[in-house]
Amino acid sequence: MKIYSVSDHAFKPYGKVLTGFDTAALVAAMKTIPMPESGTAYEPGIEVLEACGMFNEMRDRAYGGMPIQIGMCWGYNTKLNCLEYHRDSEVNVGETDFVLLLAKEDEIEDGMLDTAKVKAFRVPAGTAVEVYGTTLHYAPCQTTEAGFRVAVVLPKGTNTEKPVFEAKSEEDTWL
């Protein structure tokens, strides 16, 4: 699989690099969180990350003042094992370089995605990238044996417990 850079034109349909953010405090805060023994971990909101100086700027500049949460996905991953999407964009910032495996929601046909359509994009450490709401994504892939730590910024309440409701469409069952 070819690995593109998020600075390549090929990334444009999936997201964009956000400029003007000083991510140093967020990167330092991520380093304080221990790695899992194996696999990956995810928490939608982590106090030490939300307490760093970047929270208000991210809320205001990336989300127009909407309530946000800053959590993290971290651990060890080298493969495509799942894909998800949200109703809103997600911002990722890595403590080290990482790779995102991405596809487009509109490439789903009859509830299935041809994984040959998935593209890989390398994100440099400390770079803030917006992943559009229509982009399928999941746990990042590591670029070294040391694993990865990636901050995940989302609207408040995203990726928390699924609400109980009657599904009225196939997509409702995916939420």
Annotate each language-model stretch with its function.
Residues 125-128, 134:
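Tight coil/turn sites that cap or link beta-strands
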Residues 1-125, 139-146, 151-175:
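Active-site region of the double-stranded beta-helix
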